[in-house]
């Protein structure tokens, strides 16, 4: 796959001159695509290089990707109890804040869960748009298959909404400034924009290095997300960090001038910390017995194996709770994906949890259904391989 170097800072729009490389993986699995054939899987590898712009301090991917990849992209991380609980909480927040007559646009609606949930609770003026296959299959549920704003139906192209929602989309956008401007332009007078993105500071504080991957072009802190919103004439009126994907920002914006904001600090120590993480994974690969399997096949599993390719070679396969992934391969590897129930029929000698943000939920089920003497490790965790019963 041919990559084009990014030429501008995605926050300031200025030329990306003299950016500092935070880290680089020369050959990394490409997350979020699940091929049916191993030959196709092995082609899905690209470089991964993350830089920090010197003038603005913004952290971003150093390359440009073809947006057509998103037609193949499958978000695989939404099956946990914690994530579903967060979606319910998000919907409840909307119900508390807005009247049922509120006009709502969700940009990046995925399979339309939130649109359907809000309709079930009495909201009637709803529209979702997403380029994924899931949106195409749900067209009858007020979902549009395509890219915002160009693929909105003519009847909605210049429409204004009381609430615009975009969850875990902005980090994927190659040119976020015009995208943010389009979100702001879709707001009715007095309307609100609710944004949710992975939180860079949570990633750094918790050493969640697999939050960096090729289809995340942009890495926002609360500061830089507010700066991006300010380029579109928006100011933040409320914000929090929510406990999904290791910590995500949920911030709410209205039209208005934002206060002056400082330049983010330099992140000089990241490269050394990532080298230590890679060394930890390499040691783990040498420790696991033959027949070891992994649990969790979402995007972060693929990039974790990019940090330590020998760990991929030490695994016999992966299990995942998303039944739609069964029978496919983790991109960039030879690792087949099996459904969760298959795990309980032929228990491997050792299991490594890659879905670390859901580790507690996974372990709760394993305590009931798997032998207590089976070896378990949490990839990137702070404890070594140990029997399952030791995790109580």
Feature roles, as predicted:
Residues 2-82, 240, 252:
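N-terminal juxtadomain amphipathic helix
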Residues 93-94, 250-392:
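Hydrophobic, well-ordered beta-alpha structural blocks that scaffold small-molecule cofactor pockets
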Residues 177-192:
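A short glycine-rich, Lys/Arg-flanked "PGG" loop and its adjoining helix->strand segment in the class I
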Residues 27, 195-218, 222-224, 228:
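Short, glycine-/aromatic-enriched active-site segment of Class I SAM-dependent methyltransferases
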Residues 190-198, 375-378:
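Conserved beta-strand signature within the Rossmann-like core of class I S-adenosyl-L-methionine
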Residues 140-153:
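Conserved SAM-binding strand-loop segment of SAM-dependent methyltransferases
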């Amino acid at each position: 796959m041919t990559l084009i170097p990014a030429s501008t800072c995605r926050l300031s729009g200025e030329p990306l001159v003299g950016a500092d490389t935070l880290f680089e993986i020369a050959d990394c699995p490409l997350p979020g695509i699940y091929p049916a054939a191993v030959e196709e899987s092995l082609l899905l590898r690209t470089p991964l290089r993350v830089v920090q712009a010197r003038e603005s301090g913004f952290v971003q991917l150093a390359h440009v990707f073809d947006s057509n990849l998103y037609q193949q992209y499958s978000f695989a991380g939404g099956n946990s109890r914690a994530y579903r609980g967060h979606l319910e909480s998000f919907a409840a927040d909307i119900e508390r804040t807005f009247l049922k007559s509120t006009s709502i646009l969700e940009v990046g609606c995925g399979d339309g869960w939130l649109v359907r949930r809000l309709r079930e609770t009495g909201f009637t003026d709803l529209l979702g748009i997403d380029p994924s296959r899931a949106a195409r299959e749900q067209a009858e549920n007020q979902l549009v298959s395509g890219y915002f704003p160009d693929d909105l139906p003519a009847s909605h192209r210049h429409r204004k909404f009381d609430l615009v929602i975009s969850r875990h989309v902005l980090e994927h956008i190659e040119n976020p400034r015009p995208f943010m401007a389009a979100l702001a332009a879709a707001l009715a007078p007095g309307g609100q924009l609710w944004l949710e993105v992975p939180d860079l500071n949570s990633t750094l504080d918790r050493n969640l290095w697999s939050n960096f991957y090729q289809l995340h072009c942009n890495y926002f802190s609360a500061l830089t997300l507010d700066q991006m919103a300010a380029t579109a004439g928006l100011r933040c009126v409320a914000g929090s960090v929510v406990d999904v994907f290791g910590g995500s920002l949920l911030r709410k914006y209205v039209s208005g001038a934002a206060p002056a904001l400082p330049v983010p600090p330099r992140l000089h120590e990241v490269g050394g910390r990532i080298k230590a993480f890679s060394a930890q994974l390499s040691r783990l690969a040498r420790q696991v017995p033959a027949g070891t399997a992994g649990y969790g096949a979402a995007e972060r599993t693929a990039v974790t194996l990019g940090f330590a390719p020998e760990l991929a070679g030490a695994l016999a396969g992966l299990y995942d709770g998303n039944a739609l992934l069964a029978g496919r391969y983790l991109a960039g590897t030879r690792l087949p994906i099996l459904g969760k129930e298959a795990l309980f029929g032929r228990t491997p000698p050792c299991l490594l949890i890659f879905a670390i943000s859901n580790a507690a939920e996974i372990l709760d089920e394993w305590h009931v259904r798997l032998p207590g003497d089976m070896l378990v490790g949490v990839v990137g965790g702070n404890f070594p391989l140990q029997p399952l019963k030791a995790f109580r």
